[in-house]
Each structure stands twice: as structure tokens, then as C-alpha cells.
Amino acid sequence: MGFDPKLEITCIDGKMKAGGLTVRTDDPTQYLRELLSSYRSPRFDYLPSFTGGLVGYFSYDYLKYSEPSVRCGEQDEDSFKDVDLMLFDKVIAFDHVRQKIVLIVNMALSDVEVGYNKAKLELEQLVSLLKTGEKKQEAPGRLLGEVTPLFSKEQFCAMVETAKHHIREGDIFQIVLSNRLSAPFEGSLLDTYRVLRTINPSPYMFYFSGTDVEVAGASPETLVKLKDGVLHTFPLAGTRPRGKTDEEDKALEESLLHDEKELAEHNMLVDLGRNDLGKVSKFGAVQVEKLHSIERYSHVMHIGSTVRGEIRDDRDALDAIEAVLPAGTLSGAPKIRACQLIGELENNKRGIYGGAIGYIDFTGNMDTCIAIRIAYKKNGRVFVRSGAGIVADSVPETEYQECINKAKAVVSALTLAQEEDL
């Protein structure tokens, strides 16, 4: 848990803000790299994996800085930031296994004695706060109206048909189209996060509250992970709903693993993952460690694979994010042309959805997930977005329903959070 951020860094359309400073830039990645260079720390194995660094999100639309040919949609009525990160040098880590809290404060080494005394005082203040601090009661979240889609079933199916035309013409092989649900909303998403932990436990559970946006999510999919020079990405593509019984669940698994359309889509995205990691990996170091395993979640199951690489000496975590974002499972193949068509067909900036949520720490390591299975709130509205992979033989109505299925867990969490005493 990040506590008392030292700095919040945001960027929208090249306008970068950090604290009270505002600059114009065509390369926010380089700005972030220079910022991180001032905060370097060794890795201590006895401490939790994250001991301080940048935490937050890179939006789907962050792609425009590395690929100017991509137009990420004209409509942007909610003005989500391209990047929103907080710099934490104080961390509260809770060990669920040992039921212990670890308090971490980073200290400057320019004057060791002064830095040590300052860090010691901050730790004492943290201990005091945890023991005696007042509990801040967030206003309960509440839906104030009907959850409505951005695209009707007819509109979405028409988008699918247009995408299939581009596939038949050889323009693309696959594309991921999304739909967005939204509703008027008041209060906090913190209870929604708590419900998600119960009904949709996932590898990545997160709650993030920035200056003007709030995000709660349960993402099943890593975007890219960097640990001690080793890169990993885990493509998930191919979906079935969970069965009501073990027998039905197993039958759905067999159906998924023998579905030529789903396997073709998945294999295409594994190749795309290999290509993305290859941009920043040492020559010959990229390999597929695991292929076609079934990953089960509360409402759906997916086909999953694991791709590994070793980062080049002249590349870093920020380069890896640029190389992989957005994931092939949220864009298509070839990626750049698919993203161009997404901008034309959806004509609505995706914002946080399909971007990266996670951290880059002071040691240079990184862990980010794809921003899916999330609820995000801004300007008195809550949003849930989900997508479906379109290939040559896709059935439009089936793809529309896949978007609905993927959104169910998050919509259920929003509803349950206002009904239960949490």
C-alpha cells in the first residue's frame, strides 16, 4: 500500500505535470526516465517485492507517443490522462500469510546521518499513525442510474462486420473491438474493490485513487513483467464461460481447446507477444515457456501461454512498456494497423481500459497488468469496458455477448458493493 505520495505525475496530449511544474513534451517516457534516475535503490531479498517507485497507469492511448500514425479516437468527453503515476518513497506492506506489516521508508544518501534520522522519524510517525490514527470513512459507492452501453448491439455488430471486411481484404488478421458500459455514480469504489477480491479473485487486485480518477480492478493478465533482467508476458485469448458443474466446466474446457477459431486467435497473439518482447530483448533470448494452458476465473476461462525474454543492456522497464503497450490481446495483428482501425471504428478514446496498471520500482524492476476487468470513476460516472477478438469467421452476435460476459464480474461488484454491509 502506497502512503503519502511524494509526487503525482500526469500527462495528457503532451502536457506533463509533476507537482507544481508543467512542461510540454513529445516524449513523456524520457521525462519519466530522467525522474526515476534520481531514485535508485538496491534490491533487498528480505523485503517485499515493491519497496518504492512509480505506481499508477499508462493508458491505451499512450501508444500515440511511440506510434504517431495511430489516432486513438476523436471522442474524449471524459479527458482521461494518458499517464497518471504517483511516486511513493513510503510503503506499507501487509504479509497475508504471516499476518505482519512491514513499513518501508527510502532514505537519501547525500548525507547519510541526516537521511537516516529523517527515515527513522518517518517510520516512527507511520507506527504512531497505524496505532492511533483515525479511520477515514469513504462515502459508500452507489449507482444512480441504469448501466448503459456506448454501442448498441446493432452498432457493435456493424463494427464487427466492418472489421471482418478488413480481414478479408488482408488489411489485418485479427482485431479486438470493445464496448463501454457507464452509469451515473457517487461515492468511492473502495467497496467495489473489496467485493472484487471476494467474487473475482485474480492475479492482479488493485485500487488506485488519483487526483480526479478512481480505479478498482481484478485483472487476470500480465502486460509485461521485468525482474532482475528477465521479461515475461502472458497472453490470454480464447474464452468460455464457467460451467455450473465440474462436468460442464470440463466440457467447456475441451470445447475451448478444440475451437479452431479460438486457437488461431491465441496463436496469433502469442506470436505478437514474442515480437513485442523481441524489440527489447537480447538476440535469441525470446522463447515460449508454456503454450495453451487453461486459466480459470470466477466467470470465465481463457487459454493462456507464457513468453519469456532477457532485456538488453541498453533498455529498461519504460522501454519494455512502450514495446508491449497495448497488448495484442487488446489490439490485434498486425498491431499498428489494428490500432489504427480501432481508432476509426470505435472513435472513442479508450483511456485507462487496455492500458497498463502497476509499478516501476527504484531497483528497475517492474510489474504491470493489462487494465481489464476494471471499474473506473470520473466526473460523477463509473465505467466498465470489455472487448472481443474478431477474426475472419467471427459471429457478430457472439462477440457482442463475449463483451457482456467479460463485464459481468465488475458490474456485479458495483451492484453488490451498494447492497452489502462491508
Regions found by a protein language model. Give the residues of each.
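Extended alpha-helical targeting/anchoring segments
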Residues: 1-422
